[in-house]
Amino acid sequence: LDITFSEQKPSTDTVAANPDGTPFRNADGSLLFRPGGHGALIENLNDLDADVVFVKTVDNVCPDRLKADTVTYKQVLAGLLVSLQARAFAYLEELEAGDVSEERLHEMLQFVEKDLHCHSDAAEALEGLELLDYLYCRLNRPMRGCGMVRNVGEPGGGPFLAYNPDGSVSLQILESSQIDMNDPSKKALFEQGTHFN
């Protein structure tokens, strides 16, 4: 294993805020910047040349007594990811070679929907080259996985179905800051979640 560390880049820092939402200023009047959070790590990920990357931030490092469980579940997640990735790569090779039967295209569509959890009603009606293009776009992209634990009231995001602009529905992790907590129905959905990341 090649284990390295990547620190968040200062260019992704965000302005610190006071409790009332106004920018926090240092004693000299300058703005205080702080690391921007998980989303800011995307830039770091783009710089990596690796098949599998585990992101572990300082707020989710576990004590030594729990490390064995952490290693076990990382191995499970990596095994699942590599297995899904191998199927996706095999399908991509077939799509690139061309001459894929409609039956095989629909098998690939089932994989995208059932195993990659990305559903589109519009895709169900696609055939031939349109379906091939749709599948290629869905398969030719990075894969993400996320460990989940029971929600016991700790802060964190949770698994939600995201309704995307293209009409597809995909499984996504949403943080509380991405949920309109002023909408009682959305707040209730977030609070009733059984698991979080």
Regions found by a protein language model. Give the residues of each.
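Short aromatic-glycine-enriched beta-strand elements
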Residues: G156-L161
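A short macromolecule-binding patch
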Residues: V169-S177
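Short, surface-exposed loop/turn microsegments at beta-strand edges and helix-strand junctions
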Residues: N164-S168, F190-G193
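Domain-scale recognition of functional cores that engage charged ligands
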Residues: L1-V152, D166, Q178
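Short nucleic-acid-contacting surface segments enriched for D/E, G, S/T with interspersed K/R
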Residues: S185-N197
